[in-house]
Design a protein with these regions (language model features):
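N-terminal module-boundary/linker segments of secreted carbohydrate-active enzymes
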Residues: 132-206
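Active-site clefts of carbohydrate-active enzymes
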Residues: 388, 392, 396-397, 412-440
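Substrate-binding cleft of secreted/luminal carbohydrate-active enzymes
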Residues: 175, 423-489
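Extracytoplasmic
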Residues: 19-156
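Aromatic- and acid-rich polysaccharide-binding/catalytic face
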Residues: 371-400, 450-453
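Aromatic-lined carbohydrate-recognition surfaces of secreted/lumenal glycan-active proteins
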Residues: 174-175, 310-312, 342, 346-370, ...
């Protein structure tokens, strides 16, 4: 078999000619593709083109694999698969021998479809491309037992409910604003949704950022969390944007610091790797921050409130394992240190503070196969969350504005493979809510969605009112009114 090298090259794969339906599995030798440069050279721009069509009977999902080699860059090289002009990028790791690379699961529409492989940021060698009918896991087999063997009955009951709807429906959610935003009106986003759709989201997102050793104050997030669960029958989730002083070198643990001199970004002089090293100032601060958080989580536990807890989120940031792409301080020392910090927090809260009302949700990305290195492990994680922000960047349709109804199905299934279908996968944060038709047709079984507050839910450039009405009033979407918890009390 001869290979070809896809540089910045347009390669359209011939699934079938004319009007006949394509038979799957379908494999094509790369060198047999019309218009391909047979020599091992790179081709720039869209100089070489070939247009071919394939025909399928109905909308559906298909698996794409290619036999590839990549010797350009040991850090990996981006390759793009384009389905009917919609681009999806994958980082192909360095391999100097042929390997079978998973280009993900993608949707083909009823009728003719065009498939393109192109190396926008470099090239790889291709030998064969294989397309097969997609197969889907049995979502009902996801484990329902929590990682914490002492989990409260409320947490276990919530986990069992989540597992019972996983893969069948999607649960609606909405993040509340934190601090004193919206002039103190924490109901703004929720009233907006209800006034528009007649429904309330089932999940309410909170953040414990303001319970911190620096400028901490009680914004009553804990009280609202208890009210949402115990009085309104909802589900609560919470993140934790824990701040550190920007000038940590000159900070004395216990001192108050103006919020403008604090950050959760990577710009602080706080040495992340020391957070778990006993005897360091960073560790002393980290322990104090955990103690203050634990006080609030204990109040929830005492009120019999289970919580989907999502701390230390978005750690990888942009694709990396060494912390070079991190957005937050907890990720800037790299994947290995981050996993240790996660486990440290888990052990502190469950063992030292005896907190067992938590369903632990860890944010992961799917930039490359290396993204799995950020995973803390099955014994420390109950659920995986993905944060989707792609109305401007990382779109597949070439647009740079407006709602993006893409279900991000390839990412869902990549994350599912990371955890071997042992954990539920959720859209922990998002801008546009995926289109309900896309979710159903593509089997993108996200457990829940949860738009961020403010413009992400209120403005049409992120979520069109018509789209919100459609999904909130579709039987596939679970709203507050559908939850069984209040009825059972």
């Amino acid at each position: 078999m001869k290979g070809f090298r896809a540089g910045i090259i347009l390669l359209l794969i011939a699934l079938a000619y004319a009007e006949e339906y394509t038979t799957f599995p379908y494999t094509i030798e790369a060198e047999d593709c019309e218009g391909v440069d047979k020599a091992w050279t790179s081709v720039y721009e869209n100089v070489i083109k070939g247009e071919f069509s394939g025909k399928v009977k109905e909308d559906g999902m298909y698996q794409f694999n290619a036999r590839v080699a990549q010797i350009l860059n040991k850090e990996g090289r981006l390759q793009t698969i384009s389905i009917n002009g919609i681009d999806f990028q994958y980082t192909v790791p360095y391999y100097d021998t042929w390997i079978d690379f998973d280009f993900g699961m993608h949707r083909l529409n009823k009728g003719t479809n065009k498939i393109t492989f192109k190396g926008i940021y470099g090239y790889a060698e291709y030998d064969t491309i294989t397309i097969t009918d997609a197969t889907f896991p049995d979502f009902s087999k996801v484990p329902t037992t929590l990682s914490d063997p002492k989990a409260t009955k409320e947490a276990q009951k919530l986990q069992e409910y989540l597992a019972s709807v996983y893969g069948k429906k999607i649960i609606s959610g909405q993040q509340e604003i934190y601090g004193s935003g919206n002039n103190g009106n924490y109901e703004l986003e929720f009233d907006f949704i209800h006034d528009l759709t007649g429904k309330y989201p089932a999940i309410r997102g909170f953040d414990f950022m303001n319970y911190n050793p620096l400028y901490g104050w009680n914004d009553e997030s804990t009280e609202r969390c208890i009210d949402w669960v115990n009085k309104r029958g909802g589900i609560a989730t919470a993140s934790w944007h824990i701040n550190v002083p920007k000038d940590f070198e000159n900070y004395k643990v216990g001192d108050k610091v103006d919020w403008q001199q604090c950050t959760y970004a990577t710009s602080s002089t706080f040495k992340t790797e020391n957070a778990i090293v006993e005897g360091t100032k960073e560790n002393e601060y980290w322990n104090l921050a955990i103690k203050m958080l634990a006080e609030q989580l204990k109040r929830l536990q005492d009120a019999n409130v289970p919580l989907i807890f999502r701390p230390l989120h978005e750690a990888e940031g942009n694709a990396n394992t060494d912390g070079s792409g991190a957005w937050f301080w907890w990720g800037k020392a790299g994947a290995k240190t981050y996993v240790k910090i996660w486990k440290y927090l888990y052990e502190k809260l469950t063992k030292e503070y005896d907190l067992h009302n938590l369903i632990w949700e860890q944010n992961l990305y799917a930039w490359s196969p290396d993204s799995i290195q950020w995973y803390a492990g099955d014994d420390y994680v109950d659920m995986v969350g993905y944060d989707k922000y792609n109305t401007v960047y990382n779109r597949h349709d070439g647009k740079t504005s407006g709602p993006n109804l893409d279900a991000e199905t390839p990412i869902f299934y990549t994350l599912l493979k990371f955890v071997d279908n042992k954990k539920m996968i959720a859209l922990a944060e998002n801008d546009s809510i995926p289109g309900v038709n896309n979710l159903i047709v593509e089997h993108a079984a996200w457990l829940y969605f949860c738009p961020w507050y403010g413009e992400f839910i209120l403005e049409e450039r992120n979520n069109a009112k018509s789209d919100l009405k459609e999904i909130y009033n579709n039987e596939y979407c679970i709203t507050l009114e559908d939850l069984p918890f209040l009825k059972e009390k």
